[in-house]
Each structure stands twice: as C-alpha cells, then as structure tokens.
Amino acid sequence: MEPYVVDNLNRDDCVMIVWSGEVQDDVMCDLKAAVSTHVKKLHFENLENFTNSSTISSQFHGCSSVILCGWPNPININTLERGLLSNLSSCLQPGGRLICRESTMEDWNSFRKNLTLSGYVNPYQLPGGNHLIFIAFVPSNYTRGSSIKLPWAHSDIEAAWENVDNETSYDVDKNLINTNSLLQKSDYVTPLAACGQEFAKNSIGKRKRACKNCTCGLAEIEATEVEDKSVVSISSCGNCYLGDAFRCSTCPYRGLPPFKPGDRILIPDDVLKADL
C-alpha cells in the first residue's frame, strides 16, 4: 500500500478493506500487516457482497470510519457506479471517509459529480501514478439535522433589562406617575347641559331649566310638556285602548300601540296630515 495512503489513517479508525478479484493469501496477509499496525480495528469484505446484495450494507451500517477500496488489486472503473457508492457510504460513520483506487485514469470532474450524487462531500484526488486514488467524506452529524449555535448570534435581552434596571434604580419615585394626580376635582363634577339641550340617554346629568328671560326656546318646550301631561286619553267607544283591531276607521289612535285608560298619549303631527 502506498505510504501517503497510510498517512491518512488514524489510530482510532475502524477500517474496512473491500477487495475484488483473485488475491493470493500471502498478499492479503501483507496488506493486513501494513494496515493493522496503524488502526484500531480492521476487517475484510469482498466487493461482490456490496454489488449483488444490499443486506451486507445494512449489516455493516455505520460500523467503519474508513473504507479502503481497490487494494490489493485496483478496482475496475466500470464497477464504481452510483449504487455501489451509496452502499459503501451507508457503512461509514458520520464524518467517515472513502479511500479508493481505480485501475484507469478517468475524467475526475465527471467522477466527482457521481460522488456528490451518491452522498459524499469534499472529494479530492491523491497522486497515484497510473491509478486514480481519491478520498471522499460522508456528512458529519451537524449536517444531518443537529443544531449548532451561530457564533454571531448574540442575545442582548439580558443587557437590555440590565440597562432598564440601572436607569430606574437611582430614583424610583421620580420615574413613576402618581395615579391619584391624573384626575382633578373638576373632573368629578357632573356636567350641566347647555340651555335648550338634553343629555344623552346613558348620561346621569340633569337638563338645565329655562332661564327667567329665556330666548333659546327652552321655556316654550317646558310649557308644552306641562300641557301634554295634563291631557288624558279618553275613548268614546271604549275600544281605543285595545289596539287597531278594535278601533274605528276614524279613530285618532290608529297606528299606535294599545294603552291603558288614563295613560298619556302623544299623537305625532304627521299622523294628522294627509298622505297626498
């Protein structure tokens, strides 16, 4: 194995070597001796297990931090299709890496596109003479749904409340408003309506009485109200109190609701006028 490939291995790595073709036993022993001294755990799998069945990828799901593919024999370029690359990525831990050696030199840009579509990130090429040797990574945990606090996202809520406390602590009485001083004595006095005007229905005030020398017409209104109070409704036929169903055609109370004898009845002026 190339020395610069071994330099990319760490003591804590769990390495899976995916081999292909016919390999002699002594070659596999030499490869095992060259790699096992630099890593924590090492095991071998045949490439045909990943191409013919997907159960092998589920069996070794996330068990390796590094996959070496193409040793001792370089892998055929036509074998590294997108499906095989996806199966190998499922066997890698988050942040794991795939180190692969191909038998021929292919266009690196087109092959890097296949790596990206298969779920790998940050692929780059290593010097390999007549072979294409590259390293590709699978996304880390933080890119798979976990959250991280942004370094520039600072919360100023506590600082804002601290500033408010500092501004109000030196003189509390000066910054607070006395609610008893909002209303004056004049605000509690019941207002009087202007001469000739009435309060609203929901008002508790009393209407002002007419002046001695009233010129606004309030005196005439009060005199009319006194005359109206003295008028008592009288029915000559005795049916006027019962309603329109019992009244005569010439009854002056037609159109008014039923009433009791002695009630004060005001007939509007427009009732006595002709319609035409």
From Swiss-Prot:
Record carries keyword Ligase: no
Stretch list, region Linker: 152-189
Keyword Cell membrane on entry: no
Listed cofactors: [2Fe-2S] cluster; [4Fe-4S] cluster
Stretches for region N-terminal SAM-like domain: 1-152
HAMAP family linked to this entry: Anamorsin
Function of the protein: Component of the cytosolic iron-sulfur (Fe-S) protein assembly (CIA) machinery. Required for the maturation of extramitochondrial Fe-S proteins. Part of an electron transfer chain functioning in an early step of cytosolic Fe-S biogenesis, facilitating the de novo assembly of a [4Fe-4S] cluster on the cytosolic Fe-S scaffold complex. Electrons are transferred from NADPH via a FAD- and FMN-containing diflavin oxidoreductase.
Subunit (UniProt): Monomer.
Protein name: Anamorsin homolog
Organism the protein comes from: Schistosoma japonicum
Upper lineage: Eukaryota, Metazoa, Spiralia, Lophotrochozoa, Platyhelminthes
